[in-house]
Regions:
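Active-site-proximal betaalpha loop/short-helix elements
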Residues: 80, 168-226
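Residue-level signal for inorganic ion chemistry
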Residues: 57, 65, 104, 137, ...
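Small-aliphatic-rich amphipathic alpha-helix that forms the alpha element of a beta-alpha
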Residues: 46-71, 91-99, 174-176, 194-202, ...
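N-terminal glycine-rich phosphate/pyrophosphate-binding loops that anchor nucleotide-derived ligands
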Residues: 1-62, 102, 138, 214, ...
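Short hydrophobic/aromatic beta-strand micro-patches
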Residues: 122, 230-234
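Acidic, Ser/Thr/Pro-rich beta/coil linker or hinge segments at domain junctions
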Residues: 169-172, 245-272
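Glycine-rich anion-binding loops of enzyme active sites
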Residues: 33, 69-154, 257
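Short, compositionally biased
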Residues: 151-168
Length: 272
């Protein structure tokens, strides 16, 4: 168990352990997006910073098969930010909120030495997609293509810039895939810390392991901030899942099967 999972385990209750807390039909989720931890200001614009901060938070709601409704923003801003910078930051928040029909209903602002953002999303669902309920024999799949986020991060450190279509800033949320397949899904979560690190969370929550159908490269296994979906479903629903993924225009890769073996994550933790 890595240090992040260890710390979270100190607060165990029936609400903690998923992408958000499901309470009386609502999902409450919160994520941080901090300068010099998740991004460097010289890498991307204020507009892009706000967009990504909103998208990574909406990802948690969508990953739980919930419809995002409201957002609360907390923004710690350096005094060096100009009014134009603030307008660009606000424009990024508002554009993504409008696209996903989310209303920004409040929050907090403070002065700080760097730009730090935390967002709370309030969503609604009748059938939450949880991380528990995984059993021996289930198939394991991920959406989209993994590994590009890590490659783009390496480019940022080496070159200091990215192409406009980089996955580091252009996150694709798999709303259609989740909503169109939720009937067949047994469990799921978004891939934010990397495929193997997020598999570790599932393994710990369900006391299971995984048998991989083929070797997985380091880039695919350990690339964080992908925000693709990690999904679990019954073997008998394999054809249906692949068909519905195709209808959603989402690549779906089945790469493992759930076993009773112990699972060991071989990737370094991103947060601790």
């Amino acid at each position: 168990m890595n240090l992040e999972n260890y710390f979270i385990s100190q607060f165990q209750n029936r609400y903690i352990g998923n992408d958000g807390a499901f309470i009386d039909g609502f999902v409450y989720s919160k994520d941080a997006f901090f300068e010099n931890v998740h991004f460097k200001k010289e890498w991307i614009s204020y507009y892009q910073i706000a967009q990504k901060a909103m998208l990574v938070n909406l990802s948690d709601a969508i990953a739980m098969n919930a419809k995002p409704l409201y957002a609360l923003l907390s923004v710690a801003m350096p005094k060096s930010m100009s009014k134009q910078d603030m307008r660009e930051l606000a424009r990024g928040f508002k554009e993504i909120a409008t696209k996903y029909h989310v209303e920004i209903i409040g929050g907090d602002t403070i002065s700080n030495s760097k730009l730090d953002i935390t967002i709370t999303i309030i969503s609604k669902t009748k059938k939450p997609l949880l991380r528990t309920g995984v059993r021996d024999g289930f198939l394991v799949a991920y959406s989209g293509k993994l590994g590009n986020s890590a490659k783009d991060l390496k480019k940022l450190f080496n070159l200091g810039f990215l192409h406009d279509n980089s996955k580091f800033v252009n996150i694709k949320l798999r709303k259609k895939l989740v909503y169109n397949t939720q009937r067949y899904l047994k469990a799921g979560m978004d891939i934010s810390d990397g495929l193997f690190s997020d598999l570790e969370k599932i393994a710990l929550a369900n006391s299971v392991g995984f048998k991989f159908s083929k070797p997985i490269s380091q880039y695919i296994a350990c690339s964080g901030e992908e925000y693709e979906m990690l999904l679990f479903f019954d073997k008998r629903d394999k054809k249906t899942m692949l068909r519905r993924a195709k209808l959603s225009r989402t690549p779906l890769t089945i790469f493992a099967q759930v076993t009773r073996n112990r699972y060991r994550n071989r990737c370094k933790a991103h947060h601790f």
